[in-house]
């Protein structure tokens, strides 16, 4: 023990210590009261003159020694004494390698922010020092340089504000993020706000197209409209009023201390009912792009153009839903700040402060464009979630339009233009073409179709009643039609009538875009006489180029009553009283022809469920004999419609044969208007009119389907009882007041006219009966005199001459007379090439010396292009039904000749 103690004492020599302190006192002479107790003197700190290497001492273990290595500088003699900051400097120098290693690892994963900017050094503060921490401070950017506003300015500086139309700029978010030295999510925030204003548009993933500010005023105009419809101005006023009420309540007499009362929290609750236009809780509605559009709307609808941040947050973020979690609300407010920073960089808003009773509030003022008067009214495609009500209404109109077009048959679409019809002249009759309609019915402008339709309808109604009291030139059918419509009636090249009564009035009526009706009415001295019926003995003319179906009511002896209504399918506007554009009344007209139904073959109407669909006429299974003198009236689609069925039924009904097989023969009606129209109410009103006046005429107009050529006809739906009463010997002459109207695509054809008042038939050659009907009886068929079909002439009821536009065709012999009517009519097919070569075609009815009888007429079978009911089947087989069809042959005598080149 003693040896060990001696050894310890030898190592620590008190004598040496005392000598050292004496030398120190002599040299420095700065310290006072030095205690030199030998028993207590132990070296607690290293000596100043001779620094001790602690690692070489045996009594210091590694745990007791410092971790940091000793630098070479520390081995040198230090002149300054130990200070309180000496340990801090040692710690900083020891930690600096770790800081450097950590920064090097960060450089491997991301670029240094704002590394390539030239003005970084000028904006940074110089840190004095030569340590590693000073170098890091130099490289680190400030918060201002990392702000979204400054980043947006750098982003916008890369692209032109108004690029050329031919210049296409593509933005790659990855390249922009690398060049600007920021993360890609920061670029996403900028691009989303720019996309809300249509400055950019998404092309692909992380690829956007740059459009510039060309469409910015139009976009702002659209957002202003949407904001007005969303009633954002009322919501802001309501919020401000509630805040004022809350202020008065808190700082009023009841609350003097100014502390918030938890019972007043209900005044701050803005439920969903306060904002009927608030969107649902969808993630898309809360996106930055949608929120940016709504934020701009608040400025555009505000009168002061100043919006505080809290009001915008309550309206756009829907505080009532995020009230339990205030952190989410604060996050959304930060999103509003991001939007405001981008809008500030675009020079649309600037930050201001609004001073209120509670202090200053952050707000933003709109400094962008406010006058949109010079901008056209075209709406841009704003997102559907901004205004779902408007989008739903627009798309609903398009769906309804498409449904109506697809619900009806292809041939019953609106009549096409004449150019399209002429291109389909030689098409197959049974192949309806549902081609592309005109621009008014295009789905590409479905949202504007209703506006154009209303404009055309209003203008046409006004012009119809103005022209009703005007007196244009006497004998010209020149209706005034709206410019918007492409289905205008083309005026005839020559006068319509050359008769004694030359005082005519022409007016036009149009319902929607369904077609025009031009009717010359006899002139009168007063407005009361203008309501006289056009179906007089000398002027029963109705020229209807493009209507689908109408019925014309008129009395034989006197004019129509003013209460005669006129309506077309799909509209209820009034046109002059002698026209009634209504659906056919099947049941009523069938009951009036009961005496003839007994002699007819079994013909049944279609079932109830087919009444609203396009009707079809079906011939019996076995065709009639050639000696029956089947004389079908050719309708607009080139097929024959029996006058028997047309006159007896009052229309062209839909019938079935004995086996029930339905063959579409003649298109009758089309539901081109309102599909929800109730036909039963119209039938009942028509029944009352017929029972009042038995001599009332109902004219049924059957139009040809679009693209098919032929003749349109106007048949009477009602006859007096004595005109249809059959005799015991044979079927007498059947008075058919009818009008033949050509297809509207074949040029200004005339009307084949038959007077509507029954009377004696003149058998003198070269004369046309003035007061009698066009007699299609068995014995008087050949006594009918002249009929004319001419592109520029009209039948003269009182003149014995035939007006023709071409004098050399006046004496032209009939071309290949019809085998059904030898010496009666000669017809050139309008769709044939022969018709194209001859601008005027004349049909002259030759007088036979003796009345033709069924036995004296021999019929030859010829193959025709249009398979009309009269030309179906073998001629020998048709002769077998001669006797059974005697009663029905009086009305089936007209057939288009097949002599023209096919």
Curated annotation (Swiss-Prot):
Pfam hit, one: E2F_TDP
Top-rank taxon: Eukaryota
UniProt KW DNA-binding keyword: yes
Sorted UniProt keywords: Activator, Cell cycle, DNA damage, DNA-binding, Nucleus, Phosphoprotein, Repressor, Transcription, Transcription regulation
Subcellular location: Nucleus
GO cellular component terms listed in the entry, alphabetical order: nuclear speck; nucleus; RNA polymerase II transcription regulator complex
Residue spans of biased composition, Basic and acidic residues class: 253-269, 589-611, 679-690
Modified residues (Phosphoserine): 96, 411, 832
Single biological process term from Gene Ontology: DNA damage response, signal transduction by p53 class mediator
Chief place of localization: nucleus
Segments of the chain annotated as binding DNA: 143-212, 283-368
One GO molecular-function entry: DNA-binding transcription factor activity, RNA polymerase II-specific
InterPro entries: E2F, E2F_WHTH_DNA-bd_dom, WH-like_DNA-bd_sf, WH_DNA-bd_sf
Biased composition (Polar residues): 884-902
Positions of the UniProt region annotated as Disordered: 253-283, 418-439, 589-627, 665-690, 844-902
SMART domains in alphabetical order: E2F_TDP
Repressor found in the keyword field: yes
Subunit structure: Homodimer and heterodimer: mainly forms homodimers and, to a lesser extent, heterodimers with E2F8. Dimerization is important for DNA-binding. Interacts with HIF1A. Interacts with MN1.
Function text: Atypical E2F transcription factor that participates in various processes such as angiogenesis, polyploidization of specialized cells and DNA damage response. Mainly acts as a transcription repressor that binds DNA independently of DP proteins and specifically recognizes the E2 recognition site 5'-TTTC[CG]CGC-3'. Directly represses transcription of classical E2F transcription factors such as E2F1. Acts as a regulator of S-phase by recognizing and binding the E2-related site 5'-TTCCCGCC-3' and mediating repression of G1/S-regulated genes.
Record comment regarding domains: In contrast to classical members of the E2F transcription factor, atypical members contain 2 DNA-binding domains and regulate transcription in a DP-independent manner. Both DNA-binding domains are required for DNA-binding and are proposed to form an intramolecular structure that is similar to the winged helix structure of the E2F-DP heterodimer.
Family stated for the protein in its record: Belongs to the E2F/DP family.
Name of the protein described by the UniProt record: Transcription factor E2F7
């Amino acid at each position: 023990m003693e040896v060990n103690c001696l050894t310890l004492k030898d190592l620590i020599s008190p004598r040496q210590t005392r000598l050292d302190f004496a030398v120190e006192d002599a040299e420095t002479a700065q310290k006072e009261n030095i205690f030199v107790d030998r028993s207590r003197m132990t070296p607690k700190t290293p000596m100043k003159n001779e620094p001790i290497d602690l690692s070489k001492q045996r009594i210091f273990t590694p745990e007791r020694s410092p971790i940091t290595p000793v630098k070479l500088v520390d081995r040198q003699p230090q002149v300054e004494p130990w200070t309180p900051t000496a340990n801090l400097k040692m710690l900083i120098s020891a930690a600096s390698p770790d800081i450097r290693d950590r920064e090097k690892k960060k450089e491997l994963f991301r670029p240094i922010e704002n590394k390539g900017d030239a003005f970084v050094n000028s904006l940074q503060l110089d840190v004095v020092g030569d340590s590693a921490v000073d170098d890091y401070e130099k490289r680190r950017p400030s918060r201002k340089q990392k702000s979204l506003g400054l980043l947006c300015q750098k982003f916008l500086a890369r692209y032109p504000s108004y690029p050329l139309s031919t210049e296409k700029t593509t933005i790659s978010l990855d390249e922009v993020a690398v060049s600007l030295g920021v993360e890609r999510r920061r670029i996403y925030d900028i691009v989303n706000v720019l996309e809300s204003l249509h400055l950019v548009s998404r092309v692909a993933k992380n690829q956007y197209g740059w459009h510039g500010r060309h469409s910015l005023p139009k976009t702002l105009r659209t957002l202003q409209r949407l904001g007005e419809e969303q009633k954002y101005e009322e919501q802001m006023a309501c919020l401000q009023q509630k805040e004022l009420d809350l202020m008065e309540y808190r700082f009023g007499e009841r609350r003097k201390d100014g502390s918030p009362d938890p019972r007043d929290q209900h005044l701050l609750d803005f439920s969903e009912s306060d904002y009927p236009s608030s969107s649902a809780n969808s993630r898309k509605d809360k996106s930055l792009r949608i929120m940016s559009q709504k934020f701009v709307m608040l400025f555009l609808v505000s009168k002061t153009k100043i919006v505080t941040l809290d009001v915008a947050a309550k309206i756009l973020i829907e505080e009532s839903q995020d009230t339990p979690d205030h952190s989410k609300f604060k996050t959304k407010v930060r999103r509003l700040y991001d939007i405001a920073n981008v809008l500030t960089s675009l020079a649309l808003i600037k930050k201001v402060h609004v001073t209120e009773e509670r202090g200053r509030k952050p707000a933003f003022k709109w400094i962008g464009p406010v006058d949109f008067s010079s901008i056209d009214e075209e709406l841009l495609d704003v997102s559907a979630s901004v205004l779902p009500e408007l989008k739903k209404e627009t798309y609903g109109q398009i769906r309804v339009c498409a449904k109506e077009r697809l619900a009806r048959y292809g041939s019953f679409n609106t009549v096409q233009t004449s150019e399209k019809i002429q291109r389909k002249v030689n098409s197959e009759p049974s192949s309806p073409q549902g081609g592309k309609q005109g621009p008014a019915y295009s789905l590409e402008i479905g949202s504007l179709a209703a506006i154009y339709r209303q404009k055309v309808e209003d203008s046409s109604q006004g012009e119809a009643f103005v022209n009703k009291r005007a007196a244009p030139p006497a004998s010209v059918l020149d209706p005034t039609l709206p410019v918007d419509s492409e289905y205008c009636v083309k005026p005839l090249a020559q006068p319509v009538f050359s008769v004694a009564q030359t005082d005519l009035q022409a007016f036009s009526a149009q319902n929607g875009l369904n077609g025009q009706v031009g009717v010359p009415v006899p002139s009168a001295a007063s407005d009361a006489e203008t309501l006289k019926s056009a179906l007089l003995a000398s002027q029963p003319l109705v020229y209807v180029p493009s209507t689908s179906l109408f019925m014309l009511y008129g009395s034989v002896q006197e004019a129509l009553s003013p209460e005669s209504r006129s309506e077309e399918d799909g509209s209820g506007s009034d046109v002059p009283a002698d026209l009634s554009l209504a659906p056919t009344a099947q049941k009523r007209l069938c009951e009036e022809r009961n005496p003839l139904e007994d002699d007819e073959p079994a013909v049944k109407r279609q079932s109830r469920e087919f009444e609203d669909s396009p009707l079809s006429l079906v011939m019996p299974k076995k065709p009639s004999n050639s000696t029956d003198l089947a004389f079908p009236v050719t309708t607009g689609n080139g097929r024959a419609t029996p006058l028997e069925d047309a006159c007896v039924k009052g229309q062209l009904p839909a019938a079935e044969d004995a086996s029930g097989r339905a063959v579409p023969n003649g298109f009758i009606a089309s539901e081109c208007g309102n599909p929800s129209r109730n036909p039963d109410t119209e039938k009942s009103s028509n029944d009352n009119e017929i029972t009042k006046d038995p001599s009332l005429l109902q004219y049924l107009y059957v139009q040809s389907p679009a693209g098919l050529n032929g003749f349109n006809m106007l048949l009477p739906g009602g006859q007096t009882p004595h005109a249809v009463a059959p005799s015991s010997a044979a079927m007498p002459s059947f008075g058919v007041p009818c009008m033949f109207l050509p297809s509207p695509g074949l040029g200004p054809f005339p009307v084949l006219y038959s007077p509507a008042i029954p009377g004696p038939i003149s058998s003198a050659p070269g004369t046309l009966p003035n007061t009698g009907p066009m007699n299609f009886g068995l014995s008087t068929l050949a006594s009918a005199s002249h009929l004319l079909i001419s592109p520029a002439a009209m039948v003269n009821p009182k003149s014995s001459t035939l007006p023709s536009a071409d004098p050399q065709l006046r004496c032209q012999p009939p071309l290949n007379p019809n085998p059904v009517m030898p010496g009666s009519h000669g017809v050139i097919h309008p769709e044939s090439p022969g018709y194209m070569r001859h601008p005027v075609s004349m049909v002259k009815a030759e007088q036979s010396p003796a009345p033709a009888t069924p036995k004296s007429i021999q019929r030859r079978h010829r193959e025709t292009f249009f398979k009309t009911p009269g030309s179906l089947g073998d001629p020998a087989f048709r002769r077998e039904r001669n006797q059974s069809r005697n009663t029905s042959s009086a009305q089936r005598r007209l057939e288009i000749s097949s002599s023209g080149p096919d």
